[in-house]
A protein has these predicted regions:
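Phosphate-sensing "switch" segment of ASCE/P-loop ATPases
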Residues: 275-322
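Short, charged/polar, Gly/Pro-enriched secondary-structure boundary elements
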Residues: 30-36, 402-406
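Terminal-proximal interaction/regulatory segments of ATP-powered molecular machines
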Residues: 308, 315-408
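A glycine-rich phosphate-binding loop feature that marks nucleotide/adenosyl-phosphate handling sites
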Residues: 162-167, 316-320
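P-loop NTPase catalytic phosphate-binding loop
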Residues: 3-5, 15-26, 34, 39-162, ...
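Conserved helix/coil segment N-terminal to the catalytic DExD/H
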Residues: 170-177
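Generic detector of short, aliphatic-rich beta-strand segments that form the cores of beta-sheets
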Residues: 23-27, 297, 394-396
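Short glycine/serine/threonine/alanine-rich loop segments
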Residues: 8, 217, 367
Length: 408
């Protein structure tokens, strides 16, 4: 009756308004006011250790700028029907990170099964690997991120650090270790991944969302099919922070937010944001960023630094059928056959420095951890360095002349 008497498109009632003894009745304006991404970006807090992953969302009904801190979220589920503003929201999140964080501070992994939504970001130095468009490779990338998470926790245990913040602070005074970047893993369409390898994807998402927060790894999952076969109980239970755009039914709204309301949204960026720990979602008009603005951001970011990809992230490291050998880069089947263009330079560096570690190689040659670790394995296999001794760098066992003889 309220909608009828006011000739409104739709009415959303909030009873009661949190913190007040009143009931809220939300009426949509006849003409939507655009929310500029540039304005939202200018109102975000200055980048720091705590706010490096603050991303702009939009404005609430009072005109207050709203953002989300991904490292506090710590994972995010985004859902909504086609054309509701989901893709624009993802672009705002990515653009916020590109404009506020250096590539050595935050790394991105993007999965885009549709091949057109995120492909424009190829070449950005923040990318850990080129935008993944193959659902099978995306499933492998998720598994390898779990491996990276476990590696980080092993380093934290060796260095007696509780989380990535404490570890990076320790690296400022201990030059034997290199700082770790945050990793934000963005999946643009979860449904396509669930069709290919539902069990593997669900298991990896569960592992990451349950334990990866302290390791600085965060997951952003988006889907336009908010059904229970895509947003399963496991996914929902481990991703408490959610954003819902306009959906077609109250059932879909309950699937995303555990309550109705999203079916009454207007579309075009109108969203309900339910952060972790909050029972009542916040209604936000999402910021709009055009394709031209995004292209300018991408071009500017690429002009600052070239991308340095780690292609091993999308390689299956489970090994061959007998489980003895691992497939290395360039098609080699074992450490004995594998070689690296930087191998001789790294040997010379080790001779001069007297010790070596994967972290030192990372910092010196600006390569990924997996590649650095394989080179360390190769050096040990050839008797150039000693075995691992806890978290300390490895000792160099032979002199430069001996190394040259062995290479010959």
């Amino acid at each position: 009756e309220i909608a009828l008497n006011l000739a409104a498109k739709d009415v959303r009632i909030q009873a009661p308004i949190p913190g007040k003894s009143t009931i809220g009745i939300e009426l949509p304006n006849k003409v939507n006011s655009a929310v500029s991404f540039r304005e939202i970006l200018s109102k975000l807090p200055a980048p720091s250790d705590k706010t490096i992953l603050a991303v702009g969302l939009g404005k609430d009904i009072m005109g207050t700028v709203k953002w989300a801190e991904i490292n506090a979220t710590p994972h995010l589920l985004i859902a909504g029907a086609t054309g509701s503003g989901k893709s624009v929201c993802i672009n705002c999140v990515i653009a916020s990170i590109l404009m506020r964080a250096r590539p050595d501070e935050v790394k991105l992994v993007m999965v885009d099964p549709k091949k057109v939504e995120l492909s424009m970001y190829n070449g950005v130095p923040h990318l850990l690997t080129p935008v993944v468009t193959d659902p099978k490779k995306a499933s492998i990338a998720l598994k390898n991120i779990v491996v990276e998470m476990e590696r980080r926790y092993q380093v934290f245990e060796d260095t007696k650090c509780k989380n990535i913040t404490a570890y990076n602070k320790m690296c400022e005074t201990n030059t034997d270790y290199v700082k770790m970047p945050y990793i934000v893993f963005i999946i643009d369409e979860l449904a396509d991944l669930m069709l290919v390898a539902a069990k593997d994807v669900e298991d990896s998402i569960m592992r990451i969302t349950q334990t990866a927060r302290a390791a600085g790894i965060h997951l952003i999952v988006a889907t336009q099919r908010p059904s229970t076969d895509v947003i399963t109980g496991v996914v929902k239970a481990n991703i408490p922070s959610r954003i819902s755009f306009a959906v077609s039914s109250s059932i879909d709204s309950r699937t995303i937010l555990d309550q109705t309301g999203a079916e009454k949204l207007l579309g075009k960026g109108d969203m309900l944001f339910k952060p972790m720990g909050e029972n009542v979602p916040i209604r936000i008009q999402g910021a709009f960023v055009s394709d031209e603005e995004l292209q300018k951001i991408v071009d500017y970011t690429i002009s600052q630094q070239k991308a340095n990809y780690d292609h091993s992230l999308t390689e299956d490291k489970s090994g061959s059928e007998n489980g003895d050998n691992t497939k290395y880069d360039d098609g080699y089947e074992s450490k004995e056959e594998y070689d690296d263009p930087l191998y001789n330079d790294i040997v010379d560096f080790a001779m001069e420095f007297g010790k070596i570690s994967a972290s030192l190689i990372q910092r010196k040659y600006r390569i990924g951890y997996n590649r650095a670790a394989r080179i360390v394995d190769l050096l040990e296999e050839r008797g150039i360095i000693g075995p691992q001794n806890g978290s300390k760098p490895r000792e160099v066992l032979i002199k430069k002349e001996a190394s040259n003889d062995s290479d010959e």
